[in-house]
Amino acid sequence: YCFSGQMAQYLPAGVPAVMDFVDVDSAKFAQFADAGSAAMRWMMRREARLLGAFERQVSASVRASLFVSEAEAALFRSGGGAGRIVAVENGIDAAAFDPAGVDAATQGPLLVFTGQMDYRPNVEAVAWFAAEVLPRLRQTHPAVRFAIVGRAPTAAVQALAAPDVIVTGAVDDVRPWLAAASVCVAPLHLARGIQNKVLEAMAMARPVVASPAAAEGIDHAGTLRVAGSAAEQARAIGALLDDPDAASALGDAARARVLARYDWAARLAPLDALLGLGA
């Protein structure tokens, strides 16, 4: 079993292997190219082209290629991916991410974003949210605060810190922050596969407002709010802040959905079969 495309170069020749790509990384670089300068567009498109060729070469040499969602698997197939291509979705440890076992207290409305804070899509998401969504929310909810929770915040992320914007850096445990959230937000514009940050917030029974990109790939059945523009996100968050009962009901439904759909035992069954670990 080999995890992530970066490690594929170390696979011994002739050894049967299952390759877990997680996402189609070449497609991610193609997306980066769409938003960069002329020089960056050229570089990112070149990286996407070369990486795509490498991904296809690897997939032709292994027993199976795994992706984190059926959408990613279908994208890889459409791009010429060879061999057996299987979707093995992310799951969640719902026993660990259980609000019943976490104490948290907060004063006033708190919005929480979690993630690795030197990862470009996360950096861009929180910067956009702080600049575009928070000012709209403050017009109707002046006491609202925004917590950016995650390790290795870049200088750009640290510069967002203000009396009503908390930049935590690394934390020992993200669960108290999730438990304290009035609403968890995932305003990513670029996202691939399934966002663990969204599943974790749902498992903690928190109401979630996610961008279409962040919600894509999650079979949420309406148990989170999907909102695209800054105005739409501000309205969705504001409505949940104004109606705590509705917010609580949405969070409870989100946890129930995670328990039903994203339990690790069910999610890993295809991998067990591929590795010959089934009963």
Language-model segments: residues:
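Acceptor-binding helix/loop patch of EC 2.4 sugar-transfer enzymes
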Residues: G14-R56
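Helix-loop-beta element that forms the nucleotide-linked donor phosphate-binding surface
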Residues: L11-V15, S59-V68, A73-I92
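Short hydrophobic beta-strand element within catalytic cores of glycosyltransferases
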Residues: K197-E200, P207-S211
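Acidic donor-binding loop of glycosyltransferase active sites
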Residues: R63, V165, A179-G193, M204-P207
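A short, well-ordered alpha-helix in the C-terminal region of glycosyltransferases
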Residues: A246-R261, P270
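Conserved catalytic-core segment of nucleotide-activated headgroup transferases in glycan assembly
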Residues: A60, L75-S78, A87-A180
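Conserved acidic donor-binding segment of nucleotide-sugar-dependent glycosyltransferases
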Residues: T223-A231, G238-D245
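C-terminal alpha-helical cap of glycosyltransferases
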Residues: W264-A279
